[in-house]
């Protein structure tokens, strides 16, 4: 079946983030429901995030020809589905560790590959990235709210059943054919792909990667233990799901209005805004559990995550064509994988001792990013 390329990309983001909207908020609850202790939950989630780091860093960059991006997404989706089925076969921690690593290793490259595909298509025909990417955020809202309700009715087992169907849907979407295929390299217009070593030799790239790794890594306590923390504070799973959804509603609004709001903002200024939001958000989360404050905390997600991601896409999009896939992979690996992985393992061991103090720790992680922003010029988009 052939569909419009922008619709293909929107569906790809939608199904991917529908799965992520189940996994990210609720997987710790599923592991807890299977009898896993908090410190081991931290280890399992951290191991998964390390494999996300490796998948984004090592697997995604192997796709050097843009014409092969869709094929790579299909293979990744298929292997991801095989591993998600593996979660149904046992709950011993060693087996869960194996499946967790395998699932994240192949699930993680799908995001930089999709973003690289978006970047490739933007060079072939014009479209508003924010309005396409927003469908991923909408999917996250729906899945996190829906899963919270299903947990309230059927318990933690609803999490695994829901994500099974969701990942299978992702596989089906990748099998569709977009109307305009990404254009590969030709002999007359060959793109020189730079190495990671060449990229990291540039000071602005190093500062950029460190800055976004801190800002995204500061989400580790929230991603791993907010659901457990809020349930212990007396909130039901459905309320937790709605709180997560609220954060992504704010994300949707910013993605939708990003062109109007931040058209003339440089990546450096966007990172400053994200850093300030991070310090405020995690400080509030570590101090209060009242619902009105949690609503404010979740609205600030549009600053801590969305603005940071927009800054990253702006910084990466301004680079040479041969740098985009590798820099996108490095961003996904270090910011969305490595930084969060390290902080998740630390949070797992410290949560039983610090509880709400974990979120103050996240505020301290975000703070240095304010001073590490790369020097870049503003662009018109």
Please report, for each region that a protein language model flagged, where it lies by residue:
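Structural signature of the two symmetry-related core transmembrane helices
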Residues: 71-85, 269-284
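A late C-terminal transmembrane helix in Major Facilitator Superfamily
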Residues: 325-353
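Helix-loop boundary and gating motifs at the non-cytosolic
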Residues: 2-49, 204-243, 309
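Helix-to-loop junctions at the C-terminal end of transmembrane segments
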Residues: 54-68, 151-152, 253-266, 351
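Juxtamembrane intracellular "pre-TM" segments in multi-pass secondary transporters
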Residues: 1-3, 177-212
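Symmetry-related core transmembrane helices of the 12-TM Major Facilitator Superfamily/SLC fold
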Residues: 159-175, 357-375
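Intracellular juxtamembrane helix-capping segments at the cytosolic ends
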Residues: 27, 107-123, 306-320
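Hydrophobic core of transmembrane alpha-helices in multi-pass small-molecule transporters
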Residues: 14, 83, 93-111, 213, ...
